[in-house]
Amino acid sequence: MGQKIHPLGFRLGVIKDHKSCWYADAKRYPELLQEDRRIRQYVEKNLANAGIADIRIERKADQVDISIHTARPGVVVGRGGTGIEQLRLGLQKALGGQRQIRINVIEVARVDADANLIAEYIAQQLERRVSFRRVVRQAIQRAQRAEVKGIKIQVSGRLNGAEIARTEWVREGRVPLHTLRADIDYSYKTASTIYGILGVKVWIFKGEIIPGQEEIAAAVPAQAPRRQQRRRQQFEDRSSEG
């Protein structure tokens, strides 16, 4: 079943946390849940060119804390902070009420190791009518440079304008979907082309997380770096086959 279930939902409470963190009674829960969806849709629509990787929402009484993880923080903040202020005012107007909205902008450290950003890159290239095999090969090479443990990319639809829709996928390295401690990043995007909609799915395996390992690692002091450089992991690119 690890092949069928959503990789992030499968690991909630084990190694993954919820993207919305708040508590509410039964009467207000549906309202706040729909409000979270409106917030995410508004941010993704107004910051479509900012490379949004993740949106986290926390609530404290009448205060809403929104953390935006982005590859281009300068686009979100704007000159002199005008961009983030316009976003905050727009959200207040869209939500209504007297809620205090606080926005935190966090830069993504490893852009090429984020499934959401890679899926968005593939979708944008497909909309520009670039060959899907070339796009997938480039995305895999970018992920390899980011030293991920494994990556799987699947593209579905009328590929290269073919009459019959089909599904093509490429995997490099390990992507253990059934292992709960495996840190799997997953994203799904759609590309609108003149031939129809193409679906893009990306799985990225970043390594294994053992619960409690972070506390043990923090307690042990860091050792001096070795002089011998660690050999980078190599992948065999099979995206051109078939």
Swiss-Prot record:
Q: Which gene encodes it?
A: rpsC
Give start-end positions of Basic and acidic residues composition bias. Answer: 233-242
What's the protein called, per UniProt? Small ribosomal subunit protein uS3
Kindly give the InterPro entries that the UniProt entry links to this protein: KH_dom, KH_dom-like_a/b, KH_dom_type_2, KH_sf_prok-type, Ribosomal_S3_C_sf, Ribosomal_uS3_bac-typ, Ribosomal_uS3_C, Ribosomal_uS3_CS
The answer on whether this UniProt entry bears the keyword Transport reads no
GO MF terms listed in the record are: mRNA binding; rRNA binding; structural constituent of ribosome
Q: SUPFAM superfamilies, from UniProt? A: Prokaryotic type KH domain (KH-domain type II), Ribosomal protein S3 C-terminal domain
Q: Which PROSITE patterns match?
A: KH_TYPE_2, RIBOSOMAL_S3
Disordered: annotated segments: 220-242
One of its GO biological process terms is: translation
Q: Which organism is it from?
A: Microcystis aeruginosa (strain NIES-843 / IAM M-2473)
Family stated for the protein in its record: Belongs to the universal ribosomal protein uS3 family.
Where is each KH type-2 domain found? 39-109
Q: What does this protein do?
A: Binds the lower part of the 30S subunit head. Binds mRNA in the 70S ribosome, positioning it for translation.
Q: Which domain of life is it from?
A: Bacteria
Assembly, per entry: Part of the 30S ribosomal subunit. Forms a tight complex with proteins S10 and S14.
Print the keywords alphabetically.
Answer: Ribonucleoprotein, Ribosomal protein, RNA-binding, rRNA-binding
Record's Pfam families? KH_2, Ribosomal_S3_C
Q: Which GO terms describe its cellular component?
A: cytosolic small ribosomal subunit
